[in-house]
Amino acid sequence: MNEKILLQAEKEFDIRFSEVDSMQIVWHGSYALYFEDAREEFGRKFHLEYMRMYEFGFYAPLVEFKVNYKQPLKYQDKAKIVITFRNTESAKLIFDYEIYNTKTNVLCATGHTVQVFLDTNYQLLWTLPPFIREWKKMNGLPE
C-alpha cells in the first residue's frame, strides 16, 4: 500500500488595517508574512521550528517565494491559510499554500516557497541534514 502522506497545518487570522493598501485590499507584501506565519504554525505542529534547526547547526533561508492572487481579501475579512509540506529528495524545504476567505470559503491565493539549508558557516548543503532525515522518518515520509 503506497499512500501519499500529507503533512498540513492551518491557521485562521483576521485581516488587519496595517495589511491593506489604499483600496482596502490586502497589500501584496502582506502575503509574505502570512506564509511565514503558516511555516511557524507548521513548525509547531510537526516539531520543525526554526530554533530547533538552529540548535542542530543549520539555517533555512528562503530562496523562492511565489504567490498567485485569485480573489482579493479586504480589511476585516477573516481568512485561513493551509500549508502543505511537499516532500523532495533534495536538500530543501518546499511548502505549498492556500488562503481562503473563511466567510465565503473562496480560494483567494495560492503559492509556494522553497528554503535551502546552510550550515553555520553559511555553506550550502547538497544533501539532507541528518536531523531532517530523522524528522522525515518520524513523520512517515520517504527520504
Model-derived regions, located:
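A broad, structural micro-motif
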Residues: 26, 60-62, 108
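HotDog/MaoC-like acyl-thioester-processing domains
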Residues: 2-11, 74-75, 85-143
